């Protein structure tokens, strides 16, 4: 049954565009060029406004998720990488629960699996585009008209398909790392940099102030006579980015960088060369930022569905259980937010005070994030080629065994360590995300973690392919 299900995607192979894998290894310098070109295309797409929108100035309940999903409201990148991540999440679930049997050693099965994910991503893009238009993000459908509404949907689908191909281009070896991670980290870094150094001014009734926290610090110190009061305002102003958030962001960045040095060294020896021993490192963040990306995609899809249903059926009790949406003056990103239902409980607390005043919500939110991240991390290893069985095959091919163990027991020993490490690492990154949210950073804690782990991942990739020193983080960990 499962095999036949995968075969249903065979007809799409003939006409679905695909990036052909390079016949030989792409030189490092060319990979840098392809990576830069892909990033430039993505950034351009994120600046081109959608043609035909009436307005995109209204409240945006998904604002806090946009950085993590590389989304930019009112542009071709409205949907960001959400459909692609969601497609990956769906097929991870199908394979992990054995509802879809895939032989990853078979080239045909691997190709069909990739085609199936691509088709699912396109379908999800179409579905999300329809939801975004129908919920009135660009004006009511009656004002837009059917033709403009269809044009908006087509623009969103086309842009998401371009991103899909760019991601495939990098993954297949033309560039460095994953396009999804690159685009997300760039979007997050751009927003953090803007909040810290934005030269734009605002007037909130307290005189002209700079939006960027660092710029505001120097401005307040230069124009205020009371320097102590100026420092307090620069560090704790609650209506614009402040220096406490900047320092919190730097602290989280350095702490995550420090944790990257945590690993369990599995002693191994060679069966081919007598006396040759070494170690196989199992990192704390075994699956990198994948768990938090999948958790963010899951949350965004729940929010989109809940918001659409609540607009259409506000009095339906089941819809209310999924989420009731209303206006909250304390919401930092948008006045429109979930005020009850499931969506409210998986929405992060807007402040440390709210977390204390509503302990039930806080406990549910923390449990959801940690549980989802641990589950996604544990199941991701089965579809990413890093499961105990995959690693034991690599050991066998390289003539390695665990020191003090027989060759036949390698898989059994790895099975004791890797799944536990993956789940614990996923829960850890979820806990860091929650802690960062409560601490207060420039952007959400999740986005800071995603950016940090992606930057470190690119550092490792560049170190491996470019050949420069790799001990920066190890030395940093030892220093701390």
From Swiss-Prot:
One of its GO terms (cellular component) is fungal-type vacuole. The chain crosses the membrane at residues 33-53, 76-96, 119-139, 146-166, 246-266, 363-383, 417-435, 442-459. It comes from the Eukaryota. Residues 54-75, 140-145, 267-362, 436-441 are lumenal. Residues 1-32, 97-118, 167-245, 384-416, 460-480 are cytoplasmic. It is a multi-pass membrane protein. InterPro entries: SecY/SEC61-alpha, SecY_CS, SecY_dom_sf, Translocon_Sec61/SecY_plug_dom. Keywords: Endoplasmic reticulum, Membrane, Protein transport, Translocation, Transmembrane, Transmembrane helix, Transport. SUPFAM superfamilies: Preprotein translocase SecY subunit. One of its GO terms (molecular function) is ribosome binding. Coiled coil: none annotated. GO terms for biological process: misfolded protein transport; post-translational protein targeting to membrane, translocation; retrograde protein transport, ER to cytosol; SRP-dependent cotranslational protein targeting to membrane, translocation. Belongs to the SecY/SEC61-alpha family. Appears to play a crucial role in the insertion of secretory and membrane polypeptides into the ER. It is required for assembly of membrane and secretory proteins and is essential for cell growth. It interacts with other membrane proteins required for protein translocation. Upon binding to SEC62/63 complex, secretory precursor polypeptides may engage SEC61 to begin membrane penetration event. A cycle of assembly and disassembly of SEC62/63 from SEC61 may govern the activity of the translocase. Heterotrimeric complex composed of SEC61-alpha, SEC61-beta and SEC61-gamma. This is Protein transport protein SEC61 subunit alpha. It comes from Eremothecium gossypii (strain ATCC 10895 / CBS 109.51 / FGSC 9923 / NRRL Y-1056). The gene is SEC61.
